[in-house]
Design a protein with these regions (language model features):
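Residues forming the flavin
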Residues: 1-422
Length: 422
């Protein structure tokens, strides 16, 4: 059993995705107190939204559930959801941070009976499914959310709808009087594990995302395939619910582009290959075409690339697609571009197009900003001269889940060193 190290300066971990959870657990199990904050109503981050993830292509529920159990059993971890970092001051070993707490309007008495959702008539876009379906404004974030507790959308709090939700709850779990608050903490080190956002595909105007319903992004594809997704795992066209028969993937949609993201996000190629297997396993008569600039499939995952290439239903075409147009009557999509290898002009029709958008790091957005080093793309860079605040996972570079876990462990050790030095 780890010794408990006496200090009134816990480690603050910002971000409750797989990197933040890992950093918090590693530090706490080494005997240090940790405060973990997450801006959404649940822990698990982007990994919770995956259907399968590398390297074993298994669902995320098992791995996350084990980590949640470890967290619940460890008294040295305190976690806060719907919490955001508002300010940082001080230096290594002696920081003062302000944390903004947004109201959930549902307290610890919630039993997830769902009666509030039953009486609620207002619907909102489902953030967990990237807006591909609608949910009640009194909702459980998703089926294995941690903490397992409902949330009220602010839009109904001051309405009769909110009062109906409150009145139907026999456990007095709904409090419509809750307000935004702030707390101040003294911490010894900070692990910034705030993760990433998908690049806004609507900025790549010539691909029509947001205007053409059958143009979706890679993160949306992940939700389409998931059993707890908007279609209960059925991979169908968003416009009409028809089974897909001919799907295109466009790699580097907004990446390696001087008008958008200059860098490669590294894992998008493998993600699209994974999605291609989702489709061909579910629809054996469906053809998949992957349009790419270069394929990135490094180390042991190259074997997965080799396996996908042998699938007769999957075709790789070296091309940067120039434009997508839609047939209004059918919703079919016409892709135009050039085959880089042959110089041949491409004009092909598809049922659905998936854009492989890049990963954009979530930066530390407080005023005044702390003295941390970032590269020209906004990814945090470790500077030995600037200790005390450490990046973990995808805020440092685009990486997969396994690499994020390794990186978060290293960041936790760095944070411990900052406390020990003081």
């Amino acid at each position: 059993m780890a010794n408990i190290h006496s200090t009134n300066r816990p480690i603050l971990v910002v971000g409750g995705g797989i990197s933040g959870i890992t950093a918090a657990l590693e530090a706490a199990e080494a005997g240090y107190h940790v405060v973990l904050i997450e801006k959404s109503p649940y822990l698990g981050g982007r990994v919770a939204q995956l259907y399968h993830y590398f390297p074993k292509l298994c669902p995320p529920q098992c791995g996350l559930e084990i980590n949640f159990r470890r967290m619940k059993q460890n008294p040295r971890i305190r976690f806060l959801t719907m919490a955001e970092l508002a300010s940082i001051s001080g230096r290594e070993g002696d920081y003062v941070v302000t944390i903004k707490l947004l109201p959930r309007y549902v307290n610890e008495r919630c039993t997830c009976c769902g009666k509030c959702a039953e009486v609620c008539e207002t619907e909102i876009d489902n953030p967990f499914n990237y807006g591909m379906d609608r949910i009640k404004a009194a909702y459980l974030p998703h089926g294995f959310a941690f903490p397992m507790r409902y949330v009220l959308d602010p839009s109904i709090v001051e309405t009769e709808e909110g009062k109906k939700c409150r009145d139907v709850c026999e456990y007095n779990a709904i409090d419509l009087e809750l307000k935004e608050t702030a707390i101040e903490l003294k911490v010894g080190a900070i692990v910034w594990a705030a993760g990433w956002d998908p690049y806004d595909a609507s900025k790549v105007e010539y691909y029509g995302f947001g205007n053409y319903r059958n143009v979706i992004t890679n993160v949306m594809m992940e939700r389409l395939a998931a059993p707890n997704g908007p279609t209960r795992g059925k991979i169908v066209r968003p416009s009409d619910g028809e089974c897909v028969k001919n799907v295109a993937f466009i790699q580097c949609a907004g990446s390696r582009d001087e008008n958008h993201l200059l860098y490669c996000s590294g894992i998008c190629c493998l993600a699209s290959m994974k999605h291609a297997t989702y489709i061909t396993e579910q629809h054996q008569d469906c053809n998949v075409t992957i349009f790419f600039i270069d394929i990135r499939a490094l180390d042991r995952l190259e074997d997965f690339y080799t396996k996908v290439k042998t699938n007769e239903k999957v075709t790789f075409v070296k091309s940067k697609i120039a434009m997508i147009t839609e047939e209004e009557e059918t919703g079919d999509l016409m892709l135009e571009g050039e085959n880089t290898n042959t110089g041949e002009q491409i004009r092909m029709k598809f049922d659905m197009v998936v854009l492989a958008t890049g990963m954009v790091p979530n930066r530390i957005n407080v005023d005044p900003a702390p003295d941390v080093s970032c590269d020209e793309y906004g990814f945090m860079v470790h500077d030995p001269e600037k200790c005390g605040i450490y990046g973990a996972g995808c805020v440092r570079r685009p990486v997969d889940v396994a690499t994020s876990v390794q990186d978060a462990t290293a960041s936790a050790l760095k944070a411990i060193q900052s406390i020990v030095r003081r």
